[in-house]
């Protein structure tokens, strides 16, 4: 069985911007048959296992003073241990790093992702890793800790992540080439976006011809 780790933030977890807030103090999650990870699992079949490790608010390597445990670099070693063996990995982080509180540049965010990538490379061959640059942020995200600079930085990540993928010989995919953020919050995938991202990820995974 080929085991693929999907490591990311709320767009890997499956945050639903439509139903969010319908029940006070809760986060609403798309069901498995809508999430791109769930669709990927169904498409790959019983001989594969998609290990969903998404967390709302997760960053590449920043500590969020308002939300504990969101540093992706710090969490990754334990997650890798808990999910062994891992044959392949998909990593999509960077959206939360664009928050105005961090004031990070695209290069700084990419440096954080590189540290995560190095951890993945300790257990997964580069040709079995898919690096995904996140969605472009939209103005609706201003109500959730983002600003004009955040939007600009989110649009630079595609270029810098592609350079990083080339540096380490991993596969690359830009989520922004296939989906747009919801108009409701400017940062999360819609149902249609999950389907579109799944189709792109599946194509990449199949072309990678992962061996276990």
Segments from the language model and where they lie:
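Serine-esterase "nucleophile elbow" of acetyl-processing enzymes
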Residues: 1-55, 61-63, 78-81, 167, ...
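Short secondary-structure transition/capping motifs
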Residues: 29, 64-68, 102
């Amino acid at each position: 069985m080929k085991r693929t780790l999907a490591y990311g933030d709320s767009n890997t977890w499956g945050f639903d911007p439509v139903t969010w807030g319908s029940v006070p103090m809760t986060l609403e999650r798309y069901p498995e048959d809508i999430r791109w990870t769930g669709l990927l699992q169904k498409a790959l079949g019983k001989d594969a296992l998609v290990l969903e490790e998404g967390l709302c608010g997760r960053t590449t390597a920043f500590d969020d003073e308002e939300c504990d445990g969101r540093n992706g670099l710090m969490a990754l070693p334990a997650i890798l241990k808990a999910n062994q063996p891992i044959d392949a990995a998909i990593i999509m982080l960077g959206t939360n790093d664009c928050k105005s509180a961090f004031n990070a540049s695209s290069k700084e965010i990419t440096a954080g992702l590189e540290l995560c990538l190095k951890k993945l490379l300790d257990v997964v061959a580069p040709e079995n890793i898919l690096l995904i640059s996140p969605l472009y942020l939209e103005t609706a995200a201003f109500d959730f800790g983002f600003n004009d600079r955040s939007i600009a930085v989110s649009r630079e990540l595609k270029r810098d992540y592609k350079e990083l993928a080339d540096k380490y010989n991993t596969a690359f995919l830009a989520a922004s080439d296939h989906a747009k953020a919801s108009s409701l919050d400017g940062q999360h995938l819609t149902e249609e976006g999950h389907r579109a991202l799944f189709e792109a990820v599946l194509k990449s995974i199949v072309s990678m011809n992962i061996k276990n």
